[in-house]
Amino acid sequence: FPYRTIIGETAPLYCTSLGKVMMAFMPSEELEAYLTQSVSFHTFTRYTITEPDRLRQEAALIREKGFSVDNEEHEYGVKCVGVPVLLPESSQVAAFSASGPASAFDGSDLEQKAKALKEASFLMRERLRTLA
């Protein structure tokens, strides 16, 4: 699995698990502005979602499930799962993800990774709450 992350490399919100989590939990007017005014959609792989309506549906699903998935949408052979870190008294403060070879992120493996990340998100949220 020859995948390397380049420090400082950026990617659009709509095609990464971290970005999709950020989109899903931003205020609805910000999401609309992003989808209709701010972004020029680029297809990175045949799986990249570039239609605003599909991305709105994806955001709703992410809010419902509590995690996002990048299904090789930014890079072939790489899948990612992302979760938000939310504080009840504020807006989203962080997000984090796990990435790996697509073969390691299917079916129950994907659900297990999402569950582990959600547990870590809860712990981070509790720690941030004690610091506030």
Can you annotate each of these PLM segments?
Residues F1-Y3, I7-E9, L31, S40, ...:
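Glycine-rich, flexible loop/turn motifs
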Residues R4, K20, K79, K113, ...:
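Basic side chains
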Residues A33-S40, S121-A132:
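Cysteine/selenocysteine-centered motifs that mediate thiol-based redox chemistry or coordinate metal-sulfur cofactors
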Residues F44-F122:
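Extended hydrophobic
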Residues P12-Y14, D70, C80, R127-T130:
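Aromatic-residue detector
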Residues F1-Q37:
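Amphipathic alpha-helical effector-binding/dimerization core
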